[in-house]
Amino acid sequence: AECQYRGFESARKYIRQILNNFSFATPGTTYEVSPDYGMFVQAWNVSGYNIPLIHYVFGVDPMAYKKEINIKTDIPEDWEYAKLDNLLVGNNQLSIDYQKSGQQKSFVISCTENGWNLHFTIPVNCKSIKINGKEIPANSGSIDLTGIKNTIELI
């Protein structure tokens, strides 16, 4: 809810709180938070960091029944690198590799299956956009990606 209403920056402190209890009661994993002060089963904490990272930071909004994935990233400005690897969406696996160097942001978006429609929302403050090495108008709003692997460069 914090990500949805106030953004990821506001939610970061809660994610850190969850991760700070790593191996506290359950070796090799985070301590499950519940009203009775803990459970061995992981059920709730995963939603405390997976949903914010996948849905809000990487901006993945899948519609597997249509073989469609909308991507609207909101990666924090202080992150120089982030990677989402092999996210299962229907019979497909989506990977997003993000790198930032100065003002340039680069995304490599890949899938394991052909025939899926990926829609990438361009941030409003872009001056230059290249898709697979070809420049496109910076006022595109959203672009449709085809194929197994696509590279997006934003300035």
Across the structure, where does each feature detected by a protein language model lie?
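Non-catalytic C-terminal accessory modules of carbohydrate-active enzymes
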Residues: 1-155
